[in-house]
Each structure stands twice: as C-alpha cells, then as structure tokens.
Regions:
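Hydrophobic core of transmembrane alpha-helices in multi-pass small-molecule transporters
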Residues: 166-179, 404-420
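Extracytoplasmic gate region of multi-pass secondary transporters
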Residues: 61-63, 307-361
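Central cavity-lining transmembrane alpha-helices of secondary-active solute carriers
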Residues: 116-134, 354-366
C-alpha cells in the first residue's frame, strides 16, 4: 500500500486558509473594550497623528518647490557650465560677466515647468490607487493604515536622498501613491459614533491642517537665512525637512501597528463573508452581476450626463479645480511674488508658513457645521467667494508689502476654502443620486475632479516657460479667479440645494427629488 497522501485541491487550501483567518478575526472581535470611550479617544489620537503626517507629507513638496527647483535644476546646470554662483532665497546671481541673469531666469522657469509635468503625470497614481484601495476590504484597515503611513516615510526618504531630477520623480510618484488612499479617513468614519461622525471628522481634519505649522518649525530649524548651508553653494538643506518628517511617519506607522485595533465594521463584514458557504457566495455574486446594469463606472457616466443636477455639479467641480496648481504652488507665489514683488527672503516666506495653517484650520473646522446650518449650495457659494476675495487680497498684499502674518492668514483662507469646497461638492453629488448607483456616481464625480486637476497641472507646466517668474502669479490669478467665479455662477443658476436629502432613497428615484417633494409638503 502507498503511504502517499492526496494533494489538497485549491478549494481545500482556500477553506483551510479562510478558517484560520476566521478564527483570528473572531478572536480580535472578542477582545473586550472595557473603557470604550478611552479606546475611542486614543484611536482618534493615533489617527490624528497619521492625518497630520499625511497633510505635511502632501504639502512638503509644494512648500519647498522653490528650493527643490534650485537644487535639482539650477545648481546642477550652473555647476555643469562651470559657473560659481551664490544663491539667495529667490535669485541666482552669476559672478562671471559672461552669463546674464536672464539665462538663470530661463533655467528656473524651465525647471518649474518640468516639475509641473511631473505633477501632471503623477495623477496616474489616482487610477492605480482606485484598485489598490479596494484591497483594504480583504486584508483589513489596520494593515493598510500601517503600510500607507510607512510608504509615506519611505517616499520621503527618496526625496531626502535625491540630488537630481530623476530622484525627485521617483519620490513624488511614490508619495502620491501612498497619500491618495486616505485610509485614516475610512478608519475615522468606521470608528466614530454615527451621531457625531461628521463633527469628529471635521475636528480631526482641522487638527491635521493645523499640523502644517510643523513645516514652519522645520524651516526654522533647517533652513538658513540665505537658503544655503554654511558651506557656500550647498543647495540641499531642504532635504533634512523630508528626513525629519520621514522619521516621524515611520514612528507613527509602528505605533499604529502596535496599538491600533481593526475596525468593527471591517471585522463584521469580513467575518460574515468568511462564514458564507460557496453556494451563498455564488448567489451573491450572481446578484451583483445582475445589478451591474444599474451600477458600474460606464453606467454612472451615462447617468451623470442624463441627470442635469449631477452633471452641473460635476462641471462646477472641474471648473473650480482649474485653480489647483495656483493654490498648491504657493511656494513659488510667495518667492516670486506678484509682478516681481515678493518675499525675497527665507525669514519672510517661513513666517508666512507659520500663519497659514491657523486660518486653514478655522475654515476646515467651520465648514461642516455651516453646511448643516445654511445648506450645501450656499456653503459652496460662500467658499468660492472667499477663495476669490482672499487670493486677490493675498496678491495685493505681496505687491504692496503687507505684513507676513496677513499674507499667511490670507493664504490659509484660500487653501482652506478651496479644499473645503471640494468636500462640499462631493457631498452634493452623492446627495443628488439614487442609492443603488451612489458609489458609482461618486467615481464619476472624481473623474471630473481629476480632469480639472490635470488641466491645472498642465497650466502650471506651461505657464513658467511663457510668463517667467515675474508674471507667473499673474497667470495663476487670471486662471483661478475666473474659474471660481464661473463655478459659482453654475451653482447659483443650475444646481439645487441638497440639504435634507434622504440617502436611503428608493432605487431609481433621484434623491434630490425627495428633497423637493419634502419642501413642497
């Protein structure tokens, strides 16, 4: 007789693997929460730390764009051509009379255009992230919370080690990939009590925006008065900011791995799935396949173009996002100023980065409560109007030399209002469609958001070569203000209020119609 055992089939191996996973998840679920409020508080503390790291990591390449451009584009070019240069915060002067300042100006503008092209191309990570993000439904929120935060740290280390443009490209693509999923947001919504969910989220997000003050602190610690190290010609001090944030991100990632617990929402959903028989799973799959005619990305796009309410919200979003580069390239705006009148020193630009997180955080804290009070549409109109007024005042302040703290608060007002407006428009799109295709319509809305963002990056790639640094901010102003005004006009004329929408609207019925019927009664 043969003692050989019959190899296990794929299905048998899968069942054994799933049985082990089920045992592990049920054990995790059974862990007691004796002091639930304390557990919730410390989880929100960890998530707030991760949110701060996410915001700082996302903003750091924008906040240091001027220094990065000088380091990876202008300085290598000058060295290659044998010129001895001394750099200040925003100008590079040749000691040789054989080269003109215009040549350096052209190199600076060319470098900014190349960085803009990288940012445009990096939007491909948004598409990849859509598939990557869905893996958290199988592997768990905690695992990807750790992986994404650690990935941010590793991406920032790439920036730290990069001394050329190729290194910058790799670092930016990696960073964009890991900051896009926003796993901490999913965690917050699944852990927070339903009654206080929006309040808790807006509060944590406001704290995260306030955490941008750390950029100011790091600039104070690592950047000297003239933008160089004590060794003349070393343009790479900005890299230490990336290292500091990378270390903080790595520490917080392991804190989350050790102390965070898996969300109950994921545990309940995954355990229920693992307990299903193969027949039950097959029936559910067949039901989902049958419903693809209602949902799915293509169906959502068709619905978007047929439903005027959703279509105009999406159009207003795409138009408003043409300002994206103008808002996020604030380092260049502060450095080169408006019509040549700018900061012109590290101290001034650094002081501005101290003040803007405060006004940005105030807007972030407030908009959720205001939206529930006066309505989504009115809130979006207020935010778009605020963006327009704050940016015009910011540029006037740069030109006329207003105090740094005023410039900083105006900059924070622009950034906070613009970011908040995106959240409000997203909410309006979700509240304007029936339940059975809401998730798909949100993907459609994200597509319009991405179109506006890509066009904005394309503008930022072309503008420096055409306008140069002197008129760069004028181009940003001429793009942003009309985009906000046009978006505001579309909202006022074409879009209905969505406050009070029943998100459990029956299949096939427009949620916005339920609001109208309720108001009529």
């Amino acid at each position: 007789m043969s003692n050989q055992t019959t190899p296990l089939s794929k299905d048998e191996k899968r069942r054994i693997r799933e049985a082990k996973e089920l045992t592990r998840l049920e054990k995790e679920k059974a862990r007691p929460k004796r002091f639930w409020l304390w557990y919730l508080a410390y989880m929100m503390f960890i998530l707030a730390l991760i949110y701060i790291v996410d915001e700082v990591a996302t903003n750091l390449p924008n906040a240091l764009q001027t220094e990065i451009n000088l380091a990876i584009n202008v300085w290598p070019w000058a060295s290659k051509n044998g010129y001895d240069v001394v750099t200040t915060w925003n100008q590079v002067y040749p000691t040789s009379t054989t080269i003109t300042i215009e040549a350096f100006e052209n190199q600076i503008s060319s470098g900014l255009s190349n960085i803009g092209l990288v940012h445009t191309a990096a939007n491909a990570m948004l598409i990849v992230s859509m598939f990557y993000r869905s893996l958290a439904d199988k592997w768990g929120r905690k695992f990807f919370l750790f992986i994404n935060t650690l990935g941010m740290a590793l991406s920032l280390l790439v920036f730290f080690t990069a001394t050329n443009f190729a290194g910058y490209i790799i670092g930016f693509f990696c960073l964009r990939f890991f900051v896009t999923p926003d796993q901490q947001v999913v965690y917050i919504f699944e852990l927070a009590p339903k009654k206080y969910r929006n309040a808790i989220f807006s509060s944590i997000k406001g704290v995260a925006e306030l955490g941008l003050v750390f950029i100011w602190l790091l600039r104070k610690l690592f950047l000297t008065a003239d933008g160089t190290s004590p060794v003349e010609g070393d343009f790479y001090l900005y890299r230490w900011l990336f290292l500091a944030v990378a270390i903080a991100a790595a520490v917080i990632a392991f804190l989350a791995l050790i102390f965070a617990r898996e969300s109950d929402a994921f545990l309940d959903e995954r355990i229920a799935y693992l307990k299903q028989t193969d027949e039950e799973r097959a029936a559910i799959k067949a039901e989902k396949d049958a419903s693809k005619a209602q949902g799915g990305f293509i169906s959502a796009l068709k619905y978007t173009f047929k439903n005027k309410q959703v279509l105009w919200i999406c159009i207003a979003t795409a138009v408003a996002e043409l300002c994206y580069s103008a808002c996020n390239n604030y380092s260049n705006v502060l450095t080169y100023g408006f019509l040549g009148q700018g900061m012109h020193s590290v101290e001034q630009a650094t002081d501005v980065t101290f003040w803007f997180p405060f006004s940005c955080a105030i807007v972030t804290f407030a908009y959720g409560f205001i939206s529930d009070w006066i309505g989504r549409k009115k809130t979006s109109i207020v935010l778009l109007s605020s963006c327009t007024v704050f940016m015009v005042l910011e540029f006037l302040g740069l030109y006329y030399g207003w105090p740094d703290w005023i410039i900083g608060l105006l900059l924070g007002g622009v950034l906070g209002a613009d970011w908040a407006n995106g959240d409000v428009l997203s909410l309006m799109a979700g509240e304007s469609c029936p339940t059975n295709i809401r998730a798909s319509v949100m993907s459609s809305w994200s597509t319009f958001f991405g179109i506006g963002m890509i066009l904005s990056f394309a503008i930022s790639a072309i503008a420096p070569k055409i306008a140069g640094t002197t008129y760069l901010s004028l181009v940003y102003l001429c793009v942003s203000v009309p985009s906000w005004v046009v978006s505001l006009f579309f909202l006022m004329i074409k879009v209905k209020e969505t406050k009070g929408t029943d998100l459990n609207t029956k299949i096939g019925q427009n949620a916005i119609d339920v609001v109208s019927e309720t108001e009529q009664r």
